[in-house]
Amino acid sequence: MAKATQAVECFHSGFNCAQAVFSTYSEEFGLDKETALKLSCGLGAGMGRLGHVCGAVSGAYLVIGLKYGQFQPNDKEEKEKTYAMVQEFSKRFEERNGTTICRDLLGVDLLQDDKVFTAERIKEVCPKMVQDATEIIEELLF
């Protein structure tokens, strides 16, 4: 199954956007799926429904960190590689969607706007964000 399809199915099964993207790749990098789902849970809906950076984007940043992230204090090269990949991911995501900001992608304030309308916008918009994030990860990392 294609990674984008897998991630979108994960989202439709009840997990948030960040969980869907991050957990799709976690086991490839030695992190079990349960831990990945727990770690990324608070990042959904733009950081806990705050509408900040899109959770699919945050999930992708975590995947980039698993592949390239610095784990030695003096390894500046890995840190710079990670930052460069995050910047390139963001550029490509913005080219597709205009922004990486959740509330702008959805066109709603997740904490203030009508809950029924917000839920409909999430169903309409977020699967595409999950798919786009996953496709960009595939382009950049594999």
What would you call each of these model-derived segments?
Residues M1, F15, Q19, K33, ...:
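Electropositive phosphate-/nucleotide-binding environments in soluble metabolic enzymes
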Residues M1-F29:
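Active-site-proximal helix-loop elements at catalytic-domain edges
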Residues S23-E27, L62-G69, E135-E139:
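Short glycine/serine- and small hydrophobic-enriched flexible loop segments
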Residues T24-G42, D104-D109:
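Acidic-glycine-rich active-site phosphate/pyrophosphate-binding loop
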Residues E28-K38, L66-M85:
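Phosphate-handling active-site elements
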Residues L43-L62:
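Glycine/serine-rich anion-binding loops at beta->alpha junctions
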Residues T82-F142:
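C-terminal binding/interaction regions
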